[in-house]
Each structure stands twice: as structure tokens, then as C-alpha cells.
Amino acid sequence: MLMTTTPTLEGKPVQQYLGVVTGEAIIGANIFKDLFASIRNIVGGRAGAYERSLADAREVAMAEMAEQALKLGANAVIGIDIDYEVLGQDNGMLMVCVSGTAVITA
């Protein structure tokens, strides 16, 4: 499955547009990750635990979107948009939403 943020795939013209496909993943903030992230922020480092969690959530959302596209008979998803939203009381959760257009290319 080809997946891109661009509206076209060079050398692979779109033969048919199948519709919008989406994927979502929600992760909860862990108190230990928060503690270590705060310490890292104080000393100027990166919050690796959060970065891994974000990457995992993004992969889950992308896989969900690809699965929807396959069910429609697509061989590619173009125009992918990735959004991040903070949710929940005290901003305790993070949602990753992805969307794109399922297509059949040559």
C-alpha cells in the first residue's frame, strides 16, 4: 500500500478515487512519563517516552487507515493529513487522527 501526504504519486496516475479513509488512536498520559518528561524539560533534553508513544499511536492510526483503504480495493492513499489533539480532563490523553483519499493507481 503506497501512502503519501502529496495529492498525487509521480509516475502513477490515479485511475479511480474510492473515497476518504481515516484512522484514529488514543493514548493516555502516564504519570511516570509525565515525571520524566518534566525532568527532561528542565535539563533541556527530549521526552523519549512521549516520542515513542506518539510514534506508536501514529502507526496504529495509519494501519487502521490502510486497512480501510484495502477494504475499498485501493492500492494507495494520497493526501494524508495527520492531526494531534489533547483530550480528557487535565489533558490526560492524546488522540492521533489521520485521513486521506483511497485511490487505485496505474
Swiss-Prot record:
Question: Which InterPro entries does this UniProt record tie to the protein?
Answer: UPF0145_dom_sf (IPR035439), UPF0145_YbjQ-like (IPR002765)
Please, which domain of life does this record's source organism belong to? Answer: Bacteria
Q: Which SUPFAM superfamilies match?
A: YbjQ-like
Into which family does the record put it?
Belongs to the UPF0145 family.
Q: Which NCBIfam families match?
A: PRK02877.1
Report the protein name in the record. Answer: UPF0145 protein azo0572
Organism equals: Azoarcus sp. (strain BH72)
